Regions:
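Short, structured motif recognition centered on aromatic/hydrophobic residues
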Residues: 14-18, 47, 89-93, 97, ...
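Acidic/histidine-enriched, glycine/proline-rich intrinsically disordered or flexible terminal extensions
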Residues: 131-148
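Short, solvent-exposed interaction modules
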Residues: 60-91, 97-98
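A low-complexity, Ser/Thr/Gly/Pro-enriched, surface-exposed linker/loop concept
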Residues: 42-45, 49-67
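A short beta-strand-loop micro-motif that forms or neighbors metal/cofactor-
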Residues: 28-43, 102-119, 123, 136
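A positional/architectural concept
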Residues: 3-44, 49
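Short active-site loop/helix that positions an aromatic residue
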Residues: 25-27, 96-100
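Short, low-complexity cationic-aromatic patches
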Residues: 7-17, 82-91, 145
């Protein structure tokens, strides 16, 4: 289970040092094998391989006849990269994915249960500001009556 927010720096070889609390979960669930892919929100998604496999299976089973479905499948499956976390707990992010998410030195990791989102720091701050600006009138129906 991934939760919490952490800001980390990419090293000189564009490797992401995975925080210990996430690293342990990745080692237990997938032996350090991860899949990193693009997200329509212009961040990256990092999954332990066992969590990604059923998602990929569902995605590849979708029909290509609907253009929106096909585009989403192309994005998520097309950008997916299998990556092995090294013994120091680092993940090498491919240039194509770094460019897609506009990742530079500082990367924000956001735990989301079964996955971790990787954000450009400025884009993450804008995302948080947008979330704080929502009024209760604009809540989706599935959140009505939801309490913390």
């Amino acid at each position: 289970m991934f939760r919490g927010v952490a800001t980390v720096s990419l090293d000189s070889k564009n490797r992401l040092v995975v925080p210990a609390r996430y690293r342990d979960a990745l080692l237990v669930n997938g032996a350090g094998r991860v899949v990193v892919t693009a997200d329509p929100g212009q961040c990256l998604l990092l999954y332990p391989l066992p969590e990604w496999e059923p998602i990929e299976k569902k995605l590849t089973a979708l029909s290509d006849f609907n253009p929106r479905t096909r585009s989403l499948k192309q994005l998520l499956v097309g950008y997916a990269h299998d990556i092995d976390m090294d013994s120091a707990g680092r993940v090498l992010l491919p240039p194509m994915l770094r460019k897609f998410a506009e990742l530079d030195k500082n990367v924000v990791l956001v735990g989301q249960g079964s996955k971790v989102e990787l954000w450009n720091e400025a884009r993450w701050e804008a995302q948080v500001a947008q979330a704080l600006s929502f009024s209760s009138d604009a809540l989706p129906s599935e959140l009505e009556g939801f309490t913390l």
